[in-house]
Amino acid sequence: MAIELEDLGLSPDVADVMQRLARVGAGIARIISRNGLERDLGAGVGTNAGGDGQKALDVIADDAFRAALEGSAVAYYASEEQDEVVTLGEGSLALAIDPLDGSSNIDVNVSIGTIFSIFPAAAGPEASFLRPGTEQIAGGYIIYGPQCALVCSFGQGVQHWVLDLDAGIFRRMPDIRPLPAETSEFAINASNYRHWPQPIRAFVDDLVAGAEGPRGKNFNMRWIASLVAETHRILMRGGVFLYPGDERKGYERGRLRHVYECAPIAFLIANVGGGATDGCADILTALPDRLHARTPFVFGCASKVARVAAYHDLACEETSALFGSRGLFRS
């Protein structure tokens, strides 16, 4: 046994897949803890299907998860590191995975993770994944940080496990609590301010204005450049995350993958009462048009996610009036 799954009512096939994912996750945690002692896990080794640079650990993780799922109920394996869906067999399930999220942080000892999503297998490989996120059986992640933890939803709340290093087992913890209605934290890469669309600038400017601004309170900004780490913080204490599309070539639809990253995170957030959109529309009801499709992504406390969408609904003149001559880097 690699993870405690009692009393969750999972089908034998899903429970078996979770055991396999947990077993690989525990192994990857051990590999990460020895980075630099035997090999450089952050060394560049090529590019993936989306054109992003691959690190050694990206490939190690992808190979490990793929191998572990052979012989399971997973018929189709879709990975951010693979060009196409890999057919593993004739099982009843399909699994999408970002084997190693946040790999730019490998060499600086910042939390990284694995994001995964389980669907019922459809009639063919791509059809199993180009579908609404509401059809997920499970969505979750493993975070490799000061603790190695696994967080997953099967559609009823969000469950939480922590890796017991001595036993090599993910121990069940109390479920994640519903997200708070209000928050004083937001996460966005402010260095891209000049490229953002006006509604995003307006929203952030109003937060930065603090107690004297239209929100009437002070906010703190966070940015880790690891989606798993950002998600874990928001699940633990609330907040809102924004990765908008912007004016730069290749960033028009943001940089996060709909299938491998955004759909499973949105599934988690929805199951603790939060919201997840592309800035305007619900991520979970959207249909990706290709495996490696990207999407802008806003998620977290429902009220803040709804407010971002409201800023997009305003005409440009109205949005400008909200913050007048203010800007993130102007008084």
Swiss-Prot record:
Pfam families: FBPase, FBPase_C. Binds 2 magnesium ions per subunit. GO terms for cellular component: cytosol. Mg(2+) 1 binds at E80, D98, L100. Mg(2+) 2 binds at D98, D101, E261. Its EC number is 3.1.3.11. GO terms for molecular function: fructose 1,6-bisphosphate 1-phosphatase activity; magnesium ion binding. Fructose-1,6-bisphosphatase II is not light-activated. Keywords: Carbohydrate metabolism, Cytoplasm, Hydrolase, Magnesium, Metal-binding. One of its GO terms (biological process) is fructose 1,6-bisphosphate metabolic process. HAMAP family: FBPase_class1. There are two genes for FBPase in R.sphaeroides. This is Fructose-1,6-bisphosphatase class 1 2. It comes from Cereibacter sphaeroides. The gene is fbp2.
